[in-house]
Amino acid sequence: MHDEQIKKNIQALIDDFKTNYQEYKKDSEASIETKLIEPLFFLLGWTKNDFDKQSKAQRGEKLGHADYAFYIGDKVVFFVEVKKVGIPLEREADKQVISYALSKRVSFAVSTNFEELKIFCVEQENALRNKFRVFNSPDEYLSNFDDLLFLSKESFEQGLTLKKAESEGRLKRRVSIDRRLLEDLMHMRSLIASDIEKSYPGKYQINEKDEIIQRIIDRLIFIRRCEDTGINLENLTLGEVQELPEDKAYLKLKEIFKRYNDVYNSGLFAIAKDNDCDKITINGAIIKKLAHYLYESKDGEYIYNFDWIDADVLGQVYEQYLGKLLAQTRSGKAKLTNGQAHRKEQGIYYTPTYIVDYIVKNTVGELVKNKKVKVKDIKILDPACGSGSFLIKAFDYLYNNLSSGKESKQYRIDGQGQYSIKTEILKNNIYGVDLDQKAVEITKLNLLLKAAEKNRRLPEEIDVHIKHGNSLIDDDTIAGLNAFK
């Protein structure tokens, strides 16, 4: 279809919209998508085979996934968020689709209700304010037709949209969402450390303080992940903590911790004998800040949704997080210093995702594919598990196989009459060891995040299966406390 015919058809769509505007205002988002948004993109060269559509009922309004993902081949090139006609495109909705695109490493995002349409190059610094293109009314689809064509299939196939963004200096890459999360986690770590030192001066050594801080942050991330995947406990969210007065914030947080321990029965929330995180009190103002930073970045540019952030990305964030060592200044303030040299001295290195994928595909993947052994009998050990990237990928392979295979029937039902493949995989298949105690705790967290299901107890075996020590040496005269027994 040539440009003049496209313009003619778009004009017909605009005329219909204007004529039936009051009726369109009554329509649901799903109806607007079918009657207006999809026809517009069809005129721009896209077909039904080029996009995935996810209904509000499927995804849950609060999870906030984009309405459409548009593909060139098997690669997503932009996301689209649709709102009802007559409802202004608000900043929060725009921020949401930008954050979603960033979390999925996609360069473009679109927000529209047909009355307005905004295109964002999400790699640009301040993308929310510096929009790639804006159409303030349907008439501008024609008056700015060349700009509208940047959303055409041909433009993405030929790389024209990306080239235009580059020529305008929009690809001076902004801080990625995982990098921002890392910075916010480190800021949170410093806030808690300074508050502990202020309230309990000299009571804790640096390593003891770090263990307390990590346990608290791990719990907060677990809770946020449960919220964003829709399996959180009713009326127990960090958002509620944010809304409370400072003098009640920490009490509410402790209540949430207790309820999560009661329901999930995981060591993550249990009162630990060797960790004082449940014995100390943290300033309410600090608690409210911690909660806020796990919903939205400190600079206000990102919305964090832990359902969007893949486990391997979270693992990478934690690997870098562990590379920073907590230190204390003479004034008593906490600061973070680069600890990469220390980690390398201990032989602690991060394994890139593509290598993890290759190893798992050619080991676990081959066993599962060729059915050389029953899945329930496979034992997988990572003797230097780090943050658990290999074990997480192995978990995914086993789970995907069991979910669709006959062998799943061989997994037993638990004591409550409930059946969980995820729990059984952690009980039967997954093992890990690492020299770094912090890495061990993060591996446990990442696996628990994988296994968590609404109101299902988590396996206690994870504390036995994921261990701290030197997997090569069992002689304590050589390895000391790190000797693996």
PLM regions with names:
Residues K26, I32, Q54-E61, Y304-N305, ...:
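SAM-dependent methyltransferase catalytic region
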Residues L44-N49, C226-L238, L325-Q328:
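Short helix-capping/linker segments at secondary-structure and domain boundaries
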Residues R224-R225, T229-I271, L381, S387:
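Extended, well-ordered alpha-helical scaffold/bundle regions in very large, multi-domain proteins
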Residues K18-K53:
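Acidic-basic catalytic patches of nuclease active cores, encompassing PD-(D/E)XK
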Residues I37-L40, K95-V110, G415-Q416, L445-E453:
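Metal-dependent nuclease catalytic cores in nucleic-acid-processing enzymes
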Residues L44-D74:
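Active-site metal-binding core of divalent-cation-utilizing nuclease and nuclease-like domains
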Residues M1-Y21, E61-K62, I72-V76, V82-C226, ...:
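Short, basic/polar, glycine-containing "phosphate-handling" surface segments that engage DNA
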